[in-house]
Curated annotation (Swiss-Prot):
It comes from Streptomyces coelicolor (strain ATCC BAA-471 / A3(2) / M145). It comes from the Bacteria. It is an enzyme of class 2 (transferase). It catalyses: 4-amino-5-hydroxymethyl-2-methylpyrimidine + ATP = 4-amino-2-methyl-5-(phosphooxymethyl)pyrimidine + ADP + H(+); 4-amino-2-methyl-5-(phosphooxymethyl)pyrimidine + ATP = 4-amino-2-methyl-5-(diphosphooxymethyl)pyrimidine + ADP. The keyword Transferase applies. This is Hydroxymethylpyrimidine/phosphomethylpyrimidine kinase. SUPFAM superfamilies: Ribokinase-like. Keywords: ATP-binding, Kinase, Nucleotide-binding, Thiamine biosynthesis, Transferase.
């Protein structure tokens, strides 16, 4: 009789982000993505939001000591192979998380969350400089959308030709790679991944589905999953783009506003 194969621990991925009570974005989206992509997801909660398909009705930041304690609890015992950051609403939180990332031997995917899908501010204006000077320099990959690029760099992207300029402005703050998400532009969904020397253009047809809540969180988490598996940044980003495109295609209505992408779309295939 053949002995049973012992269980193998999956790649370990940690999200440092806020909670979305509606389950579409934030740590809920992150953990669903991590499970769907075959990794073990862990979380450090930075804020609690009252949020649904119509927007954010309230947000409460957790104390820095609570964030630090959660992070140390996970990293010092279990360990991590990649970290993803999301909502960090204050300068103090940004600087604390940047310090923690700098002391962790794992790639970091930084999603510099500035506003929600509905336009609700999730980052204090006083924290912008800390994102620029403390958080972005410790990022393996930074994944801003066009609104966040403008918020952080002042560069406005009106068409695809502006994406290189946006990437250069983000890279000037120190991340190893910048993934500029051009999903808000007209035409195909075009993203640019670059480290300043090599470029990777990622294109997908624009999908006729308004239910896209959680897209940014999902993409950044999917990239982190790829990095935790040992993939290079370009390979991880390309796989993440494919996963998110499928999730948007399967996005479903929820409540009276914008529904979420379907994180489990590939599980039934």
């Amino acid at each position: 009789m053949t002995a049973p194969t012992p269980p193998v621990t999956p790649p370990l991925v940690l999200t440092v982000a806020g909670s979305d009570s509606g389950g579409g974005a934030g740590i809920q989206a992150d953990l669903k993505t991590m499970l769907a992509l075959g990794t073990h997801g862990m979380s450090v909660l930075t804020a609690v939001t009252a949020q649904n398909s119509r927007g954010v009705q309230g947000a409460w930041e957790l104390p820095v000591e609570a964030v630090r304690a959660q992070y140390r609890s996970v990293v010092d015992d279990i360990g991590v192979q990649a970290v993803k950051t999301g909502m960090l609403s204050s300068a103090e939180l940004v600087e604390t998380v940047a310090e923690l990332l700098a002391g962790t031997d794992a790639p970091a995917v930084v999603d510099p969350v500035g506003v929600s899908k509905h336009g609700d501010a999730l980052l204090a204006s006083s924290a912008l400089e800390s994102v620029r000077t403390r958080l972005l320099p410790v990022a393996t990959v930074a994944t801003p959308n066009l609104d966040e690029v403008a918020q952080l760099t002042g560069v406005r992207v009106d068409d695809e030709t502006d994406l290189r300029r946006a990437a250069a402005a983000v890279l000037a703050f120190g991340p190893r790679w910048a993934l500029i998400k051009g999903g808000h532009l007209a035409g195909d969904a075009v993203d640019l991944l670059t480290d300043g020397s090599e470029e990777h253009w990622l294109r997908a047809p624009r999908l006729d589905n308004r239910h896209t809540h959680g897209t940014g969180c999902t993409l950044a988490s999917a990239v982190a999953c790829g990095l935790a598996k040992g993939q290079s940044v370009p390979v991880a980003v390309r796989a993440a783009k494919e996963y998110v495109t499928g999730a948007i295609t399967a996005g479903f209505p929820l409540g009276g506003g914008i529904g979420p992408v379907d994180h489990g779309w590939a599980l039934g295939e």
